[in-house]
A protein has these predicted regions:
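N-terminal subdomain of nucleotide-sugar transferases
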Residues: 1-64
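A conserved catalytic-core segment of Leloir-type glycosyltransferases
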Residues: 39-99
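Short glycine-/acidic-enriched loop or helix-start segments at secondary-structure transitions
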Residues: 15-16, 47-48, 80, 118-121
Length: 141
């Protein structure tokens, strides 16, 4: 099965959503599934890119056989409603644009607490006519 997972956070970020998603996807790969992550370049919580990363339109990375596509977003520190919302909405649009080109997907998963990842994942599932899973771990804001 090919799982497309939409998440705003993924390692090397060390927050709970990033670690949780990594642990889930690593187990799915160990069990023979193909996993593609669409996320942004690591910058949480300070809004500064981690060393070795750029905020480019698309960057491919593989960690433990997990396919990771990092997409361009508006990057800001984790403070202030307006800037954070622009960051989240920019990720939603970027993940939709690049998610459309992910081939042969069997299921699309979107994770909270970032609300706009859910919209992106739902939209991609509808376009691809595959099941949508909403992983609710935290209610935002």
């Amino acid at each position: 099965m090919h799982i497309l997972f939409i998440t705003d956070n993924f390692p090397p970020e060390g927050n709970a959503p990033a670690i949780r998603t990594y642990e889930h996807t690593r187990e799915w790969v160990k069990n023979g599934h193909t996993v593609t992550i669409i996320t942004c370049s690591p910058n949480f919580p300070d809004g500064k890119l981690f060393d070795g990363y750029k905020n480019k339109w698309i960057q491919r990375e593989i960690i433990d056989d997990i396919n990771i596509w990092r997409v361009k977003t508006f990057i800001t520190a984790n403070e202030g409603f307006f800037k954070r919302t622009i960051d989240y909405v920019s990720f939603m649009f970027s993940s939709i644009i690049f998610g459309v080109f992910t081939k042969k997907v069997d299921v699309v998963i979107g994770t909270s607490p970032q609300f706009f990842t859910i919209i992106s994942a739902w939209f991609l599932a509808k376009i691809k006519r595959v099941p949508f899973i909403f992983e609710l771990r935290d209610i935002w804001p």
